[in-house]
Amino acid sequence: MVLLAQGACCSNQWLAAVLLSLCSCLPAGQSVDFPWAAVDNMLVRKGDTAVLRCYLEDGASKGAWLNRSSIIFAGGDKWSVDPRVSISTLNKRDYSLQIQNVDVTDDGPYTCSVQTQHTPRTMQVHLTVQVPPKIYDISNDMTINEGTNVTLTCLATGKPEPAISWRHISPSAKPFENGQYLDIYGITRDQAGEYECSAENDVSFPDVKKVRVVVNFAPTIQEIKSGTVTPGRSGLIRCEGAGVPPPAFEWYKGEKRLFNGQQGIIIQNFSTRSILTVTNVTQEHFGNYTCVAANKLGTTNASLPLNPPSTAQYGITGSACDLFSCWSLALTLSSVISIFYLKNAILQ
């Protein structure tokens, strides 16, 4: 103990000796406890500079800083090897401890002891280093089948411990309860999309990450229809479907499969629809057409008859000869009525 005290500057030998004797009585890792000292709490964000305030009574008094049982400064002598630590020298009375780029390892109690004429005056500061939220583990993007149970995981660090929340951001933007794990039982196609995990603790902006969930489901045909079909002109049938993965479409006329370019037929397949076009409609093209949609989860189909246009339009039925006869009869009756009215007029 005497050898250690002799290693300090002469002006600070007494202070170093007192501190060393005090610290040597403590078990390793235990902090110095001054029951008469006032305790102040300081919150500092990780990466910022912490200034722990302490003032001497006059320019001649001596001070010291301790962190737990370790001496940081004794008077003007620096005992710590940490280059981030220094004493503020704004004026002769200022003996504040400055720690640059604070980290979580700097968290804990600090004690400033000032030697007065009678007894040491001490002040304690408990430094709490706050850490912004950081998501360090989140579920990978996934592709699963409809009806499967799914658990999404989002783990984050921070001080205070961040609150974690989930949100289905597409397509419904539905919020969920807070928690590291989001359980979805029997997932449906409507629950596909992006899920956003947000970690927040008010130290900084929330940390946000996303998981994309693709839900496979068997295809469905939502609509099949055609426009007016006239011989000698083009006609088309449109088949609207849905499925994940996108379904492959096929066309049949009766039991016979149709191919693109066959007998004036053009087939255009897209992710959610297929269009069958007949470039020059003839009598052979009329009949029953079936659209088939298939992916690895299933197959479905829908049919539509392609019929020739009705020869009786605008509500008129019957043959052309019948129509001519009706017009002849109408003209004859009209002539008879006209002659009758003319005769009566002459007689009068």
UniProtKB/Swiss-Prot annotation:
GO biological process: brain development; cell-cell adhesion; cholesterol homeostasis; fat cell differentiation; feeding behavior; lipid droplet formation; locomotory behavior; negative regulation of glial cell proliferation
Subcellular location: Cell membrane
Post-translational modification: Glycosylated.
Family: Belongs to the immunoglobulin superfamily. IgLON family.
Domain Ig-like C2-type span(s) in chain numbering: 32-128, 133-215, 219-307
Record has Phosphoprotein as a keyword: yes
Modified residues (Phosphotyrosine): Y181
Organism name: Rattus norvegicus
Glycosylation: residue positions: N67, N149, N269, N280, N288, N301
Principal location class: membrane
InterPro entries, per the entry: Ig-like_dom, Ig-like_dom_sf, Ig-like_fold, Ig_I-set, Ig_sub, Ig_sub2, IgLON_domain
Keyword Signal set for record: yes
Propeptide regions on this chain: 319-348
One Pfam match: Ig_3
Tissue: Highly expressed in brain.
SS bond partners: C54-C112, C154-C197, C239-C291
PANTHER family cross-referenced by the UniProt entry: IGLON FAMILY OF IMMUNOGLOBULIN SUPERFAMILY-RELATED, NEURONAL GROWTH REGULATOR 1
Residues with lipidation of kind GPI-anchor amidated glycine: G318
Membrane topology summary: Lipid-anchor; GPI-anchor
Name recorded for this polypeptide: Neuronal growth regulator 1
